[in-house]
Amino acid sequence: MFYSIKELVEQAELDFQGNVAELMITTEFELTGREREEVLRLMERNLEVMKASVELGLSEKKSRSGLTGGDAAKLDHYIKKGKTLSDFTVLSAARNAIAVNEHNAKMGLVCATPTAGSAGCLPAVLTAAIQKLGLTHEQQLDFLFAAGAFGLVIANNASISGAEGGCQAEVGSASAMSAAALTLAAGGTPYQASQAIAFVIKNMLGLICDPVAGLVEVPCVKRNAMGASFAFIAADMALAGIESKIPVDEVIDAMYQVGSSLPTAFRETAEGGLAATPTGRRLQKEIFGE
């Protein structure tokens, strides 16, 4: 078992030849008593749900509230025109993140990674990485186990709850997990993966949770797209050999401190931020008649 990113990196290097996925599978057995076959089967199911949520989310159908829906399809059409400013892989990830979260807003089945509100980042980065890197099925599962390993530390030492730590804890954690797994999938070391986490979280520090009308739609859906995009930049920076001046575990500690200091208006209560704007209040009244 590991209790910090430093310990995770050391154990992966010393005991698992740098294979973070194998470390996580072993840790899962230690925590739950599940045998390897069951652990793999459950992760297979997660992978299936993630891929399906990307495909189903490309629909142009609106959510019941009318706040979201159709943006993933718009971005898909834009990508297919071949005149995008952003790299195809990164923009594909952004599209897929929007797709998953629009699917979630329409009561579709998603895999909380680590939460439903931040469920778009990891599937988006993974599916884009499959295209870019040609990941095998086994490598796709390794991607998810590795993301889970790093996410476990973040959850235990900071938070993955918007109600507790703001959106930095939800989309921030999801983006960081994705960046770490992506770094490994591209041939990086566990240490480089840890640096990718630091880059993402430092960029996300202080991000509030301010859902309009209290629904996980605005600004949540688009924040997932940005989080997926950040993951690619962070992974590239780490693979280039860039290092965080602040150790990653201290960055995670700072994330916890910042989240704990946020006023309740900025922690999923829909009482501040974008939710409290005139338009945010108007939309809430239109939806709930309040």
Task: Describe the residue ranges of each PLM region.
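Generic N-terminal targeting/processing segments that precede catalytic cores or assembly contacts
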Residues: M1-G108, I130-K132, G241, V248-E290
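Acidic-glycine-rich active-site phosphate/pyrophosphate-binding loop
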Residues: D87-N104, Q139-A158, K202-P211, A270, ...
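Glycine- and small hydrophobic-enriched segments that form the cores of compact globular domains
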Residues: L85, A112-A119, Q131, L135-T136, ...
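Well-ordered alpha-helical segments within folded domains of soluble proteins
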Residues: S118-T127, S175-A180, A228-A234
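Alpha-helical support elements that line or immediately flank enzyme active sites
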Residues: P123-G134, L182-G187
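Functionally critical mobile loop/hinge segments
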Residues: L184-E290
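Conserved phosphate/anionic-ligand binding catalytic regions in large, soluble enzymes, centered on
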Residues: M107-V125, A169-A174
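Glycine- and acidic-residue-rich phosphate-binding/metal-coordinating active-site segment common to enzymes
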Residues: L144, F150-A163, C167-M177, L182
